[in-house]
């Protein structure tokens, strides 16, 4: 019985490349001369550092621009609160979303059931498994989800025949 998984996870290699490119541009830009502006990457989160709120917004703009060029959807990013650190400097933690949330998974399963396509959707942890008897039905579900589910960047993997 053919099946596939609907997941929501960023390509971490491309995220790392985008962070490195953003840091390179920030270090060479004239308006950041003498500034301690940078973006650091840890497990599943990014931290943007800058001298003030205005420069922090510019750092985030550079990061978003580089992510868009690397084909990383910016809907993966979840911005935390801006925190003041030593002196006037500020930082902001940016979490990279991973996995399909419970509400989104329920909505995806509901969309699959309402579409009247002969497939079954089941929630399995942070993914939604879709299985059916025909490969064409699964491809129709993928097309329908790409068109209708816009809240999160969905990815389809683990396609089995």
From Swiss-Prot:
- Entry keyword set: Nucleotide-binding
Concerning PANTHER family, the annotation shows: UPF0234 PROTEIN YAJQ
Name the family.
Belongs to the YajQ family.
Instruction: List the InterPro entries hit by this protein, alphabetically.
Output: DUF520 (IPR007551), UPF0234-like_C (IPR035571), UPF0234_N (IPR035570), YajQ-like_sf (IPR036183)
The protein, known as: Nucleotide-binding protein Rmet_2899
Q: Which domain of life is it from?
A: Bacteria
According to its UniProt entry, what is the function of this protein?
Nucleotide-binding protein.
Q: Which Pfam families does the UniProt entry name for this protein?
A: DUF520 (PF04461)
| Keyword set includes Ribonucleoprotein | no
Query: Under the cellular component aspect of Gene Ontology, which terms does the record hold?
Result: cytosol
**GO MF:** nucleotide binding
